Amino acid sequence: MFDGEDLKKIFAMDGFLRNIEFEVSYISEGSIEIKVPLKENLMRVGDIMNGGAIMAISDAIGGLTVMTYGSVINQVTVNFNTEFIRPIGTGPVIFRSSMVRIGKNIAYVDVAAIDGNGQLCSKSMGTYYIYR
């Protein structure tokens, strides 16, 4: 079973993601939640979280959600859409994923980003190709 240590190892191997601090809240088949502190490397002008960082973390968590299924070896993003609802200015930011549907070759995952005040700030939907 894919666990929090596996998630940390994958982040550490990635040239971009290795610079993002996070704490794993939970991992189960089809669902992941992490908490990300708002650090300077994630912020933009206006003292809010950078939209690209929100999308990158959301995409990473979406893809890793696919890998919580035992038969999955790897995955790649086919499509990824994000709706920014409100700016994120307080942390920690919770990124919460949930599997919508997993098939033989394609998986669909929803990811929400919730600010430190408990407000939904972005919603993403990722489509991932599965390697088994």
UniProtKB/Swiss-Prot annotation:
Broad class of enzyme this protein falls into: hydrolase
Protein's UniProt keywords contain RNA-binding: no
Xref: CDD domains: PaaI_thioesterase
EC number per UniProt: 3.1.2.-
Listed InterPro entries: ACOT13, HotDog_dom_sf, PAAI_dom, Thioestr_dom
Keyword Ribonucleoprotein: no
Keywords: Hydrolase
Source superkingdom: Archaea
Name of one Pfam family that matches: 4HBT
GO MF assignments: fatty acyl-CoA hydrolase activity
Entry similarity comment: Belongs to the thioesterase PaaI family.
Protein name per the record: Putative esterase Ta0293
Origin species: Thermoplasma acidophilum (strain ATCC 25905 / DSM 1728 / JCM 9062 / NBRC 15155 / AMRC-C165)
Organism lineage string: Archaea, Methanobacteriati, Thermoplasmatota, Thermoplasmata, Thermoplasmatales
